[in-house]
Amino acid sequence: MIPVVIEQTSRGERSYDIYSRLLKDRIIMLTGPVEDNMANSVIAQLLFLDAQDSTKDIYLYVNTPGGSVSAGLAIVDTMNFIKADVQTIVMGMAASMGTVIASSGAKGKRFMLPNAEYMIHQPMGGTGGGTQQTDMAIAAEHLLKTRNTLEKILAENSGQSMEKVHADAERDNWMSAHETLEYGFIDEIMANNSLN
């Protein structure tokens, strides 16, 4: 159930679902698994807010276990495409594709709450049963290219070398807020809401 907010206006009462009300304040919630429908909703909100006023920051709150690489990269590409700065605030967790999205916020404006977690790892892929050997080779090559793309983004976002990111992402690598800050994925740990 989505909560409803009721506001008093000069014309009387007006009710909004909570996400529409947050959007008025340029806040987008990226929560749950990253998949095409969720990504399309986030992208539409980013484009709408940028068209509305590209001089004002957009606040992207992230709490996701990750998910689809293509859906996540569509969000990242849109964040980079629009003119407005996107501040990212990690609450709960940013794992897997979520780390790529959260670390792609505007430099100097990437935040994390004190008890949130980050997790990087190599992308997962697979082929269904009955797959031909040639298709398996194609899938394996695509997975290696995808891993290289994601590690390049993570290296650029953190300031770490590709080699370090590659080694650190070999297996699930969980980081506390302080470890995430030291790694370079975020710029500040927020104890309270001090966003401008």
Curated annotation (Swiss-Prot):
GO biological process: protein quality control for misfolded or incompletely synthesized proteins
Top-rank EC class of the record's enzyme: hydrolase
GO-annotated molecular function: ATP-dependent peptidase activity; ATPase binding; serine-type endopeptidase activity
GO CC annotation terms, alphabetical: cytoplasm; endopeptidase Clp complex
UniProt cross-references to PROSITE patterns, sorted A to Z: CLP_PROTEASE_HIS, CLP_PROTEASE_SER
Family annotation (InterPro entries): ClpP, ClpP/crotonase-like_dom_sf, ClpP/TepA, ClpP_His_AS, ClpP_Ser_AS
Keywords: Cytoplasm, Hydrolase, Protease, Serine protease
Positions annotated as active site in the UniProt record: S96, H121
Keyword Cytoplasm part of the UniProt annotation: yes
Origin superkingdom: Bacteria
Pfam families: CLP_protease
Catalytic activity: Hydrolysis of proteins to small peptides in the presence of ATP and magnesium. alpha-casein is the usual test substrate. In the absence of ATP, only oligopeptides shorter than five residues are hydrolyzed (such as succinyl-Leu-Tyr-|-NHMec, and Leu-Tyr-Leu-|-Tyr-Trp, in which cleavage of the -Tyr-|-Leu- and -Tyr-|-Trp bonds also occurs)
Keyword set includes Transmembrane: no
Subcellular location field: Cytoplasm
EC number: 3.4.21.92
Function of the molecule: Cleaves peptides in various proteins in a process that requires ATP hydrolysis. Has a chymotrypsin-like activity. Plays a major role in the degradation of misfolded proteins.
Family: Belongs to the peptidase S14 family.
HAMAP family for this protein: ClpP
Matching PANTHER family: ATP-DEPENDENT CLP PROTEASE PROTEOLYTIC SUBUNIT
Assembly and oligomerization: Fourteen ClpP subunits assemble into 2 heptameric rings which stack back to back to give a disk-like structure with a central cavity, resembling the structure of eukaryotic proteasomes.
Name this polypeptide is given: ATP-dependent Clp protease proteolytic subunit
Originating species: Streptococcus pneumoniae (strain P1031)
